[in-house]
């Protein structure tokens, strides 16, 4: 137990992020009456977009993905939108009393117009894909929620707090760990105060991937009230193809390969050449006096015999444990630090009076520690 906790406090476990090939990012932004959803679809194949007109028992919609048998993302004519991210696989338990549709996501997009209705379908029906995927749903009113599955809880529904919601490839309720792409998206949104296509693409550009191990195949921005889709291919944000959903549905069912929409644009050879882009600069500078206030000794609440010492080291913090290698923490916000290079995050608990009371290590789970001494 003691050694395990020391290793946890040093962030010595393996990375929690998904592989580059499946590391996607979704976010919704609600500001000044605008409701937008952005997505980077990171994979190793070119994308397609297809339109499905309405019928007496089905809402019309636009789908994006790689195979018409499975939509990775979608928006229907009511302004309900979803996209998905891959997750580390966990045991999923079905409910024998619940029906299991062939494809619950299709059923929701065919029949629902709001996030509340979508969430109710997840409560009503079984959804086996939740074992290794999660879904962000958003609607034209601005509501959004992330639906996932936790082995110790079951269905996890996290609604938007504040003016945006972000999800990458970790379960939000499993721990407070957020990957560098998540942190970078937060930083870009904090620096820009509007909800515009330009702001959405600024986020997407900051967190896109490229390289032989996986790349951003396509990116989408959905304007839910306007029922419009802005499509970008292979992380080339200088070229956009805009779709009006109502107009496209009026053309009947049709499918488009994304590459054909961007003649002369980026190619697969362009985005797979060179080194893999998998790191995102999230480090910020903090004044020395802010860093100094976190120095001291901390003891994990579940094992108070373990002592972790933290001291300022230039523009970072250094973590010391007897008999273990030192670890470096670099700041991403005034109270949140990443264990370099990305072995977890640490958030410091600061009282309203500015007193540092403890910290929380965020990894596969959250480990709380109390500050017991100052320098």
Where are these regions (language model features)?
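A broad structural signal for short, well-ordered beta-strand segments within beta-sheet-rich domains
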Residues: 24, 71, 355-359
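Short N-terminal edge-element motif at the start of the domain
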Residues: 106-112, 117-120
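Sec/Tat-exported extracytoplasmic proteins
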Residues: 112-113, 125-129, 211, 298, ...
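N-terminal signal peptide c-region/cleavage motif recognized by signal peptidases
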Residues: 18-19
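Secretory/export targeting leaders with adjacent low-complexity proregions
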Residues: 117-136
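C-terminal, well-structured catalytic/ligand-binding subdomain of enzymes
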Residues: 25-110, 133, 138-282, 290
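Peripheral terminal and inter-domain segments
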Residues: 270-375
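Bacterial N-terminal signal peptides that target proteins for export
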Residues: 1-9
């Amino acid at each position: 137990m003691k050694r395990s906790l020391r290793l946890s406090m040093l962030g010595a476990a393996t990375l929690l992020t998904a592989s580059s090939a499946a590391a996607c990012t979704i976010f919704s932004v609600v500001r000044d009456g605008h409701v937008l959803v952005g997505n980077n679809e990171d994979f190793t194949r070119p994308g397609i977009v297809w339109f499905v007109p309405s019928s007496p028992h089905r809402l019309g919609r636009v789908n994006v993905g790689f195979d018409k048998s499975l939509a990775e993302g979608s928006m229907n004519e009511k302004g309900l939108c979803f996209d998905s991210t891959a997750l580390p696989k966990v045991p999923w338990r079905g409910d024998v009393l619940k029906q299991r549709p062939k494809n619950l996501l299709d059923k929701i997009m065919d029949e629902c117009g709001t996030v509340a209705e979508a969430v109710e379908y997840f409560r009503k029906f079984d959804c086996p894909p939740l074992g290794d995927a999660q879904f962000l749903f958003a609607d034209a009113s601005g509501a959004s929620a992330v639906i996932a599955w936790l082995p110790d809880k079951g269905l996890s529904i996290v609604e938007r707090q504040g003016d945006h919601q972000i999800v990458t490839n970790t379960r939000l309720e499993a721990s407070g760990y957020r990957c560098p792409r998540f942190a970078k998206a937060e930083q870009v949104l904090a620096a820009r105060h509007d909800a515009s296509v330009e702001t959405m693409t600024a986020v997407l550009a900051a967190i896109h991937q490229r390289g032989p191990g996986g790349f951003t195949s396509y990116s989408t921005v959905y304007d839910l009230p306007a029922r419009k889709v802005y499509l970008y291919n292979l992380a080339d944000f200088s070229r956009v193809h805009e779709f009006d959903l109502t107009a496209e549905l009026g053309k009947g069912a049709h499918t488009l390969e994304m590459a054909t929409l961007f003649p002369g644009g980026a190619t697969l050879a362009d985005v797979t050449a060179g080194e893999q882009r998998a790191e995102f600069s999230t480090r910020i500078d903090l004044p020395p006096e802010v860093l100094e206030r976190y120095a001291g000794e901390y003891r994990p609440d579940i094992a108070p015999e373990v002592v972790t010492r933290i001291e300022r080291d230039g523009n970072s913090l250094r973590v010391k444990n007897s008999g273990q290698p030192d670890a470096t923490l670099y700041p991403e916000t005034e109270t949140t630090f990443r264990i370099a290079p990305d072995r977890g995050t640490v958030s410091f608990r600061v009282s309203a009076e500015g007193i540092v009371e403890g910290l929380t290590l965020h990894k596969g789970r959250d480990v709380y520690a109390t500050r017991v001494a100052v320098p």
